[in-house]
Amino acid sequence: SSASGASDVLGALGVNLDLEPADVARVFHEVGLTFVFAAKFHPGFRHAATARKEIGIPTVFNILGPLCNPVRPEASAVGVSNLTRVPQVAGVFRTRGATALVYRGDDGIDKMTTTGQSHVWEVTQGTIREHTVNSEDLGLAKARPEDILGEGPEHNADLARSVLDGDAGPVRDIVVLNAAAGLVSFALANDPTEVERGLMDRLAEKIALAQSTLDSGLAQAKLEQWVAATQS
């Protein structure tokens, strides 16, 4: 977690983000994932890009981005840094009839955190359920804020590579926790009865899945496939 955004880090990892919408769709069909760059799909956003970087703090664009996803995915996992905005974002997903996990760490980051508790709003079938998640209850060691603080794109790309290489530690822990949130949302969209099971049990299962995907090398292989597809 840092001032360096996802697009910056993906670029440092070799993912070509300067793709037209048709190629973004092609990459998705070839690889199974893709990156929807706001500057390409919402050209108006680019006029605020420089100011956002200069300000260096979250703005309304951090909230608008996930809500303006042109794909309109049936399942979403979205972090919001402003606590008062979290229920509002959850309400948008409810109005759309979508499934989502919307969350904020008590340390103020727009992620599920490993430094303490996270507040989670689970949206499914027009209802919103609120949860509190302590990562230690999921078997993840408590981290210090400085343990998960990133820097520039190259530094964060190196951290990503170390996680993909199987290195253990606080960075891997927060990665698998947030990956689990996305997997829980996806499972819930496919089977709404999943909501009847405890969120902690579902998160624990998906953390195990994320860990095995890293340890097996499948995540590393998928990144390499993704990079190649965006460069072709």
What are these model-derived regions, one by one?
Residues G11-D18, D23-S232:
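Glycine-rich anion-binding loops and their surrounding alpha/beta cores
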